[in-house]
Structures are given as structure tokens and as C-alpha cells.
A protein has these predicted regions:
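N-terminal topogenic module of multi-pass integral membrane proteins
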Residues: 1-55, 183-196
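Physicochemical signature of membrane-embedded alpha-helices that form the seven-helix bundle of GPCRs
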Residues: 3-10, 31-35, 57-64, 90, ...
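Membrane-proximal helix-loop-helix units in multi-pass membrane proteins
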Residues: 58-128
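C-terminal transmembrane-bundle signature of multipass membrane proteins
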Residues: 130-196
Length: 196
């Protein structure tokens, strides 16, 4: 397994864990992570030499850019809203926001797939700062770092003299999602406390 495939595998494992854990309680977080994980699964295959998944990998990466970060932002910012709690609302968001994003990108508005995750990242950073939770703040900063790598990374660029831009994107994204998806400890304590 080459280093690019390994970085996608790490991202896949993080996203699959988050999606599995949060599917019933936080579907927006779960589906957002799941879409990124699906793109990562196809990336593992692509970077392992399976040429026929190049197109599907690009499509699901685009879909994840257009809607997954929106779902993550909504799930973190408004955890009690319908978009964060109801699977049907999450499904509609994927179809509408993802469909519009893919259509706009195909029609030549390529910045759409960068603007939406960028705005979502700002919402996530703002939410993390308001919550004053260290893991969420670090996760949000790692997420912003992954977007910076995606926007500025060129082939041949090395980060920390070791990771190319693809690997840096995947590892930053994996670490950011893992930290952002950690449930609040007080919320866990409240849920596990015996009724009064």
C-alpha cells in the first residue's frame, strides 16, 4: 500500500468510526463523515492502482466537498435542529445541497466546491470557539489546515518534509474530524446519570 492510499485508509477508518457511532444520535455528523469516508474508500482503491474508480472517487470527493462539511457544520452548530437530528432532513440536504453543488461545479462554477466547505469551516471554527472545548478548537483548526492544503498544495509540495499535499490533506482531515466529532463530556455524563 502506497503512502497516498494509506492516508486515505486512515481517513476512511476515522470517518467510518464516526459514522457508525453517531448514526442514530447525530445523523448530520454521521452522514457528513460517511460521505467523506466513501470518497476515502474510493481513494484507497484509486491510489492502490484500481484505475476504474478514478471517476467515482472524483465525484464522491466533489459531493463530500459540496455537502459533507455543510452537514458537519449544521450538526455541530445547531445540534437540536431537524437538520442535525432527523435522517430525512439529512437526506434532503444531501440531495438538494449536494445536487446543486455538483451541478454548479459541472456547469463551470468550480469555486462552489471550495466556497461551501470554506463557509462551513468558518461556522465550525466559530462554534468551537464559542463552546471553548479544546478538542473542538484543535479539530476546527486542523480542518481549516486541511482546506489550506487543498487550496494551496501543488504536486511536489512536501509538508513537514515528509507528507505530500494529498497525504497532508487526508491526515489533517482525519484528525480534525476525529476531534470535532468527540461528544461533549458533560453531555455524556448527563446521558449516563441515573434519573433523579
Amino acid at each position: 500500500m502506497n503512502p497516498d492510499a494509506l492516508s486515505d485508509l486512515v481517513l476512511l477508518l476515522v470517518c467510518a468510526t464516526v459514522a457508525w457511532r453517531d448514526l442514530r444520535t447525530r445523523p448530520a455528523i454521521a452522514v457528513g463523515a460517511g460521505l467523506i469516508g466513501l470518497a476515502a474508500l474510493l481513494g484507497v482503491l484509486r491510489f492502490s492502482g484500481v484505475a476504474m474508480v478514478y471517476g467515482p472517487h472524483r465525484f464522491f470527493s466533489l459531493l463530500a466537498a459540496c455537502v459533507a462539511f455543510t452537514l458537519l457544520a449544521a450538526g455541530l452548530r445547531w445540534p437540536d435542529a431537524a437538520i442535525a437530528r432527523r435522517a430525512a432532513a439529512v437526506g434532503r440536504c444531501v440531495v438538494v445541497v449536494g445536487g446543486v453543488g455538483v451541478a454548479l461545479t459541472v456547469m463551470g462554477v468550480g469555486l462552489w466546491s471550495q466556497i461551501v466547505p470554506g463557509l462551513s469551516a468558518l461556522v465550525i471554527v466559530w462554534t468551537a470557539l464559542q463552546q471553548r472545548r479544546a478538542p473542538a478548537i484543535v479539530g476546527a483548526l486542523l480542518l481549516v489546515g486541511s482546506f489550506a492544503v487543498a487550496a494551496t498544495g501543488k504536486p511536489g509540495t512536501l509538508y513537514l518534509d515528509y507528507f505530500n499535499s494529498t497525504q497532508a490533506l487526508h491526515y489533517l482531515l482525519a484528525a480534525g474530524i476525529a476531534l470535532l466529532a468527540l461528544p461533549r463530556l458533560s453531555a455524556q455524563a448527563d446521558a449516563s446519570a441515573p434519573p433523579a
